[in-house]
Amino acid sequence: NLIQLSNMIKCAIPGSQPLF
């Protein structure tokens, strides 16, 4: 799931903007 993946990245990188 791309949305789940982007959520993980968003949590892993603080201050990063959500991809979706």
Swiss-Prot record:
GO BP terms, alphabetized: lipid catabolic process
Subcellular location: Secreted
Cofactor note: Binds 1 Ca(2+) ion.
Tissue specificity as recorded in UniProt: Expressed by the venom gland.
Enzyme Commission (EC) number: 3.1.1.4
Cellular component GO terms, alphabetical: extracellular region
Highest taxon, organism lineage: Eukaryota
One example GO MF annotation: phospholipase A2 activity
Protein keywords: Calcium, Hydrolase, Lipid degradation, Lipid metabolism, Secreted
Catalysis performed (reactions): a 1,2-diacyl-sn-glycero-3-phosphocholine + H2O = a 1-acyl-sn-glycero-3-phosphocholine + a fatty acid + H(+)
Cofactor annotation: Ca(2+)
EC class of the enzyme, as a word: hydrolase
Sections of the chain in a coiled coil: none
Chief location bin: secreted
Protein family per UniProt: Belongs to the phospholipase A2 family. Group I subfamily.
Function: Snake venom phospholipase A2 (PLA2) that exhibits weak enzymatic activity. PLA2 catalyzes the calcium-dependent hydrolysis of the 2-acyl groups in 3-sn-phosphoglycerides.
Name of protein: Phospholipase A2 II-5b
